[in-house]
A protein has these predicted regions:
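Hydrophobic/small/kink-forming positions within alpha-helical transmembrane segments
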Residues: 26, 50-55, 59, 81-86, ...
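Cytoplasmic-side transmembrane-helix entry/capping segments in multi-pass membrane proteins
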Residues: 40-49, 96-108, 127-128, 152-162, ...
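Alpha-helical transmembrane segments of compact multi-pass small-molecule transporters, enriched
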Residues: 20-24, 76-90, 105-106, 164-168, ...
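Specific transmembrane alpha-helical segments of multi-pass solute transporters/efflux pumps
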Residues: 29-77, 113, 198-216
Length: 279
C-alpha cells in the first residue's frame, strides 16, 4: 500500500485493487462457463457485504498505513476472530462458550494496551477508532455471508462483491481521491503494487477466504487473519517503522487469545438445501 500511495490516492487504491481482483475473477467465471446463482433477493446482502467487507476497509487502510504505519494497522486486523464471536450472537444466533468468552475478554484487554500505547506515541484517537472499525466491519461482513449468501459459489460471491465495491469506489476516487504527484520513477512501482494487491492480495486471497467462510464458518475462516499482524509487524520493522515492546506484547497476547478461542472451531460443511436457499 505504501508503494501504491506514491502516485495513487487511498480511495483510488481501494477502487483499483477491487477492480483488478474483480476483472481476474470475472475472466475465470466466463472461461469456466459457470451458471449464475444470484437472485434478486441477494442484492441487499451483497451491497452490505461489498461496502462493509471491501469498500470501507480497502479505501481506509491505505490512509491509515500512511498515518500510523502498516505494522500498527496490521495488528488491529488480528482482532477479527474475536469480534466475529461477538457479532455472531445477534447475526447468527451463535453464543460463545466459556472458553471463547475468556479469549474475547483477554483479547479486549490486549487491545486496550495496544490503544494506550498508540495514544502515548501521539496516534490520534480518531485514527485508532477508524483502525479498529476495520476488523469490526470484516466480522459483520463474514457473518452476513454465512447468514444470507452461503448459497452462492465462492467464485461468484467474490466476483460480485468486488464488482460492487468497484462500482462504489471508482466514482468516489475521481471525486474525492485527492491529488498525487505522478512521475516516471514512481508510477511503475505504484502500478505494480496495485496490480499485485488487486490480483493476488484481493482477488484470489478473498476467493479462498470466502470458501472457508462458507465451508467452515466465519470464526474458523477468520483464523487466517492471524498471519496478517505477524506479517505486518515484520514488514513494518523491515520498512523502518517504530515498533514498541508493548505493541509486540499486545500482539502476542491477542494471538494467544485467538488460539484459545479457535481451538476446535472447525466444523463439517453443513448440508445445503436444494430448494429455496436462504435469501
Amino acid at each position: 500500500m505504501k508503494r501504491a500511495m506514491l502516485c495513487i490516492s487511498p480511495v483510488g487504491i481501494g477502487a483499483w485493487r477491487d477492480f483488478g481482483g474483480a476483472l481476474v475473477l470475472t475472466l475465470i467465471f466466463v472461461v469456466a462457463r459457470r451458471q449464475t446463482s444470484f437472485r434478486r433477493s441477494d442484492l441487499l446482502p451483497l451491497l452490505g457485504v461489498a461496502i462493509l467487507g471491501f469498500a470501507w476497509p480497502h479505501s481506509i487502510q491505505p490512509e491509515l498505513v500512511g498515518r500510523i504505519g502498516g505494522a500498527f494497522v496490521g495488528m488491529t486486523v488480528g482482532m477479527t476472530p474475536l469480534l466475529t464471536i461477538l457479532v455472531s450472537v445477534p447475526m447468527l444466533g451463535v453464543y460463545p462458550t466459556s472458553r471463547q468468552v475468556f479469549g474475547v475478554i483477554g483479547a479486549l484487554l490486549c487491545m486496550a494496551f495496544l490503544m494506550r500505547d498508540g495514544l502515548r506515541h501521539h496516534v490520534a484517537l480518531s485514527d485508532l477508532l477508524v483502525a479498529f472499525s476495520v476488523p469490526t466491519t470484516y466480522s459483520i461482513a463474514n457473518c452476513w455471508i454465512r447468514r444470507s449468501l452461503r448459497h452462492l459459489p465462492p467464485l461468484e460471491l467474490t466476483m460480485l462483491c468486488l464488482l460492487t465495491a468497484s462500482v462504489v469506489l471508482l466514482p468516489l476516487s475521481l471525486m474525492a481521491g485527492g491529488q498525487r504527484t505522478i512521475d516516471s520513477q514512481n508510477w511503475p512501482v505504484a502500478l505494480a503494487a496495485v496490480a499485485t494487491l488487486g490480483v493476488a492480495g484481493t482477488g484470489f486471497a478473498t476467493l479462498l477466504f470466502n470458501k472457508l467462510v462458507q465451508d467452515q464458518g466465519p470464526l474458523f475462516a477468520s483464523m487466517t487473519t492471524n498471519l496478517v499482524p505477524v506479517g505486518a509487524v515484520i514488514w513494518g520493522w523491515a520498512d523502518g517503522e517504530h515498533i514498541t515492546i508493548t505493541q509486540v506484547a499486545a500482539l502476542v497476547g491477542i494471538l494467544v487469545m485467538v488460539t484459545i478461542v479457535q481451538f476446535g472451531s472447525a466444523q463439517s460443511p453443513p448440508p445445503v438445501a436444494p430448494v429455496e436457499p436462504p435469501a
